[in-house]
Design a protein with these regions (language model features):
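Membrane-embedded helix-loop-helix hairpins and adjacent transmembrane boundary segments
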Residues: 1-178
């Protein structure tokens, strides 16, 4: 599925929509196939070299998603007061905080020699590994989203009603006895 998404994003969204709107369907399909082949080669290389890299990338991806998306989703469901400005500010705070922390210890885009500090426990903030920093980013996201949402206008009434309807599902009808 991910390979299909990558090839479609490159061939249709990037090439057809932006770079070459006149590309034929056959040309777009050819670009998609080439992109998929390149993605397979890159994924295979990164999965093998260095060993353990794929597991680290998955851990970092979950940390990044947790720091940037999870708080906004939770607050969007459980708080009628969280607004778009708060959610965006929180998401950016979570995302930027974890990316900066990762780049400080792992290097910019994992390029050797670009790390600011050694990736060892004695240098980590409160002993928190870059692989685990997503929890800190999520906490920062919650705090910033809460502060910004309460410092700005609340969401419109229809949005607050939508949040309430998500929190308290009504179902399709009454309960029945089987």
């Amino acid at each position: 599925g991910l390979l299909l998404a990558i090839s479609s994003a490159i061939s249709h969204d990037l090439i057809k929509r932006n770079l070459n709107p006149n590309i034929t369907d056959a040309g777009e399909l050819k670009v998609a196939r080439i992109t998929m082949a390149i993605a397979i080669v890159v994924a295979t290389y990164l999965g093998i070299n260095p060993p353990g890299f794929a597991a680290q990338v998955v851990a970092l991806a979950f940390g990044i998603a947790g720091a940037s998306l999870f708080p906004a989703l939770m607050m969007g469901i459980f708080s009628k007061r969280i607004n778009n400005l708060g959610a965006i500010a929180g998401m950016l705070t979570g995302l930027i905080s974890i990316l900066v922390y990762i780049f400080i210890f792992k290097g910019w885009f994992f390029i050797s020699g670009t790390a600011s500090f050694p990736d060892t426990e004695e240098y980590w903030l409160f002993g928190i590994s870059p692989l685990s920093f997503g929890a800190v980013g999520a906490l920062l996201n919650f705090i910033v989203a809460f502060i910004v949402s309460y410092a700005t206008m609340p969401p419109p009434a229809h949005i607050q009603e939508l949040v309430e309807s998500v929190r308290s599902p009504r179902g399709a009808g009454g309960a029945i006895d089987h």
